């Protein structure tokens, strides 16, 4: 949206801004004063209290944590309130899983206490291991092992003559998002699904099991949501609108994101007892995990399982704590910062490590406010509820306030679980340079160098030792001292509605890689003891997170200059287009090889006659995709971005307040130009044509998703259509940059 102001108004604006920043006087002093307000001890105290009891959605402690957070914000000088939504959140009434043949064994149940972790024995009020938004049911059937339960796994099973129709499948966690596993099982005709944590992923295959080490113990279970998040997140009954008390709701049977089959999670201690009994063909090498057994595929009737799940499907309250510091000169431009406060059980790492870091920022900002400092833009802090079930709290708030957010929000900054290690950032690439500038100013608490310097060193050493897989751009940047690229955003946390539905630029920030939180992820063992023993002793990286995010908030809220550098975004999109072209070329090459193998009957001839594997199914040949318009659009984007960045570098410092305000107005909502109201194929809620969660990756991002996924899934008409639509949004984006450059140059 274009904004303009009269000269007098601009002069008053500038005077007000100068007065507001008088205490402290400059950016470095402001950030130093902010840092002085960050206390790791505060974070430890808050976490210990917030993680002292189960805090899942609807629990008494979840409400108590929200009320305590509200009181803190108000004491620190924020204008704060709780906004409550009534969300569908199923909780378990019955969870039964048992082997009934070749012998009867009752499996599952609550995780046992471990020595040294006091809260692990506090199971009163804790929900048993389960997954949300599965389908209620009571089924008995043969068991089939489907590896990760992803499309290629079902192709491998089909080539071995194994059909899961009418069966219960068991899949291991990993590679793809958990919700895809039962969804694909359901689509292939299975009547039930078990998902287990294999020790190769996060158990003794990666380290000592808890409590000796931080890895997942024998009977640790990963809870989670299995709702079809890649269709839309949020309350399944209120897509596109806030789940207020009086909202119009779908019937549960009509909600497309709720599964129809029963699903339960399982520990590897229990899963091993099932898998050890399976007969049928020996599993191919990619199917083999870390259990001390020979993995078989089953399906021969040797193992039968009884699976029963029944849930309480009533609405539960979700308490979002929303706090504001009103901007002095641009109060209708918002910086939104969020982290959720609900967990699956105690949730010390996920989410409270990020939540207490956010509270530290809020306390430090409140102290600055009381000293007379004022941000130019309004700062909004949100402690979300109900993220774990399917991003309910943030999505319902974003949908409920959609018009206001699209009119006011400049940037959304998200955090979630946090731990020891390297800075990890994903998000809108026009903010990549800002992230790198901030990373150079924050000190790593264990090495004494900047977090940017440590990350560069880790990338270089990882490439040398072949222990990491940095992409070429990251390695080149690390070696030359340039900006480290940030990643793309898929889904899995509270940025999704902001970025992918509303088109608000977003960043997701955390530290990690040297913690051991994966081993207790979504289990009863994600506790204060585990967090402070194995993930971030002393919460030193919690303090580093506060200082990192706080600097970004302060710099964007100051509005003394636009913080975007658009050449980074343009270069990134150009890279994505190269990847899409290579994908199409590689697919055509692969298709040609497959056709020759089929023509020559090579699959049958090469197959072991005693262990026959059928030929790969024939598939349509990948045609040439019409990408000329997208090529031209990327060229226009690169030219416009380069020209804008150059104009700002040459003349930005000389802008008067009126033109600066006009420029802010032109850039505030520029990311919304990357939306297409028609959405992505088959999932219209997702409207962003540059970043989306993958249909078969979930948390993982797909870039240029309308084109890329259409090629991957052989929807070639869609690929051509979305190449054109993506080209249009990039041309519109480039035109806005040209207009912004005109403002800088006085045209």
Where are these regions (language model features)?
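Soluble metallo-hydrolase cores and metallopeptidase-like ectodomains found primarily
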Residues: 121-156, 232-349, 363, 367-371
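C-terminal amphipathic alpha-helical interaction region
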Residues: 656-747
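Second-shell loop/turn segments in exported
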Residues: 30-37, 51-60, 130, 134, ...
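Metal-dependent peptidase/peptidase-like ectodomains
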Residues: 104, 135, 216-282, 330, ...
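Alpha-helical metal-binding/catalytic segments enriched in His/Glu/Asp
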Residues: 321, 337-391, 396, 549-552
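A conserved hydrophobic secondary-structure block that centers on an alpha-helix together
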Residues: 147-213, 328, 332, 344, ...
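Noncatalytic luminal/extracellular "stalk/propeptide" segments of secretory-pathway proteins
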Residues: 24-29, 36, 48-163, 199, ...
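Gram-negative bacterial Sec-dependent N-terminal signal peptides
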Residues: 2-21
């Amino acid at each position: 949206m274009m904004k303009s102001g009269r000269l007098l108004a601009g002069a008053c604006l500038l005077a007000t801004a100068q007065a507001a920043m008088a205490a402290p006087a400059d950016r470095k002093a402001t950030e130093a004063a902010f840092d002085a307000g960050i206390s790791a001890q505060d974070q430890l105290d808050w976490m210990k209290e917030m993680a002292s009891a189960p805090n899942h959605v609807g629990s008494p402690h979840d409400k108590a944590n929200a009320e305590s957070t509200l009181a803190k914000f108000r004491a620190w000088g924020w204008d704060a309130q709780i906004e409550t939504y009534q969300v569908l959140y199923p909780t378990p009434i019955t969870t039964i899983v048992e082997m009934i043949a070749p012998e009867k064994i009752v499996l599952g149940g609550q995780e046992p206490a471990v020595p040294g972790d006091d809260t692990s024995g506090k199971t009163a009020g804790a929900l048993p291991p389960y997954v949300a938004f599965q389908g209620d049911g009571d089924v008995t059937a043969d068991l089939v092992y489907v590896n990760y339960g992803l499309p290629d796994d079902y192709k491998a099973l089909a080539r071995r003559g194994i059909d899961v129709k009418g069966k219960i499948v068991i899949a291991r966690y990993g590679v793809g998002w958990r919700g895809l596993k039962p969804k694909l099982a359901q689509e292939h005709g299975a009547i039930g699904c078990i998902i287990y944590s294999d020790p190769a992923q996060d158990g003794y295959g990666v380290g000592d099991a808890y409590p000796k080490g931080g890895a997942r113990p024998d009977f640790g279970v990963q809870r989670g949501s299995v709702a079809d998040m890649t269709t839309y997140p949020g309350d399944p009954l209120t897509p596109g609108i806030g789940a207020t008390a009086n909202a119009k709701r779908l019937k549960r049977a009509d909600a497309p994101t709720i599964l129809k089959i029963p699903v339960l999670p399982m520990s590897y201690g229990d899963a091993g007892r099932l898998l050890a009994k399976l007969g049928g063909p020996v599993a191919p090498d990619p199917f083999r995990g870390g259990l001390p057994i020979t993995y078989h595929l089953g399906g021969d009737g040797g193992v039968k399982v009884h699976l029963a799940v029944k849930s309480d499907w009533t609405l539960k309250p979700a308490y979002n704590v929303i706090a504001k510091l009103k901007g002095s000169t641009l109060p209708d431009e918002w910086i939104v910062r969020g982290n959720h406060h609900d967990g699956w059980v105690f949730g010390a790492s996920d989410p409270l490590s990020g939540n207490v870091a956010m509270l530290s920022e809020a306390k430090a900002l409140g102290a600055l406010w009381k000293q007379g400092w004022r941000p130019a833009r309004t700062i909004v802090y949100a402690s979300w509820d109900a993220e774990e079930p399917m991003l309910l709290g943030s999505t319902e708030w974003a949908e409920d306030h959609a018009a206001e957010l699209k009119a006011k929000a400049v940037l959304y900054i998200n955090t979630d679980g946090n731990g020891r290690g390297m800075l990890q950032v994903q998000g809108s690439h026009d903010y990549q340079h800002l992230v790198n500038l901030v990373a150079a100013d924050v000190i790593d608490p264990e090495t004494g160098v900047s977090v940017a310097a440590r990350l560069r060193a880790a990338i270089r050493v990882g490439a040398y030792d072949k222990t990491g897989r940095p992409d070429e751009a990251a390695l080149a940047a690390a070696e030359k001292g340039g900006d480290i690229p940030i990643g793309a955003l898929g889904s899995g946390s509270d940025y999704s509605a902001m970025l992918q539905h509303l088109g608000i630029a977003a960043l997701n920030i955390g530290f990690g890689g040297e913690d051991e939180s994966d081993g207790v992820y979504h289990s009863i063992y994600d506790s204060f003891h585990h967090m402070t023993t194995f993930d971030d002793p002393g919460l030193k990286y919690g303090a580093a997170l506060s200082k990192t995010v706080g600097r970004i908030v302060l710099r964007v809220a100051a509005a003394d200059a636009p913080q975007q550098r658009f050449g980074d975004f343009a270069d990134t999109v150009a890279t994505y287009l190269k990847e899409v072209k290579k994908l199409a070329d590689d697919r055509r090459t692969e298709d040609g090889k497959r056709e020759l193998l089929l023509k020559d009957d090579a699959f049958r001839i090469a197959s072991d006659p005693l262990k026959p594997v059928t030929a790969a199914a024939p598939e349509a040949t990948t045609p040439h995709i019409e990408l000329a318009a997208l090529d031209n659009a990327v060229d226009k984007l690169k030219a416009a971005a380069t020209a804008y960045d150059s104009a700002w570098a040459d003349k930005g410092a000389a802008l008067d307040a009126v033109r600066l305000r006009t420029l802010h107005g032109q850039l505030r909502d520029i990311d919304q130009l990357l939306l297409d109201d028609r959405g992505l194929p088959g999932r219209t809620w997702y409207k962003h044509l540059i970043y989306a969660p993958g249909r078969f990756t979930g948390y993982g991002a797909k870039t240029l998703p309308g084109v890329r996924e259409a090629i991957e899934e052989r929807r070639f008409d869609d690929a051509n259509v979305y190449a054109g639509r993506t080209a249009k949004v990039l041309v519109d984006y480039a035109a806005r940059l040209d207009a912004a450059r005109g403002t800088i140059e006085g045209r």
